[in-house]
Amino acid sequence: STAAFGLALRAWNQGWPIGVFQFVKSAKWKVGEENALRVLGASGEGGSVDWHKMGEGWSWVQRDAQMDNEEKAREGWEQVKRDLAAETYKLYVLDEFAYPMHWGWVDTDEVVSVLRERPGTQHVVITGRNAPEKLVGLADLVTDMSKVKHPMDAGQKGQRGIEW
């Protein structure tokens, strides 16, 4: 996500309209990248920024919540498809979207087909681990970021300004 939002800042600076679609992360979470890009998007100085949250986060134990998140992920993908067809944005950030594909909530073959056939010169960035090989094969650029060391490994809680 960090690299994707850095790219979004560059796109904003070029005046590109940006659509951010957050999958998996809760709509209740207040994250710094959202606040910053919303302020920049509303400033009138660069491109516009629209922020869409798909679901309320995930749970490892609540099946009802998982089913709701599966539905929200599918609804979110449907919205992305509509926006791609309408060429709504020049840059799409599908944050954590690799997970719904990995978990089987969204059909990878359909995603690959839609991205391959999208009109215009729209750029799509998908974040998240375990990206399906078909998606990796289609991509122009793939980054695999891996943690070497993190304060949480030593028991430190997430830090304001660092993790959010």
Locations of the language-model features?
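Conserved P-loop
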Residues: 2-85
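Short secondary-structure boundary segments
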Residues: 22, 53, 96, 128-129
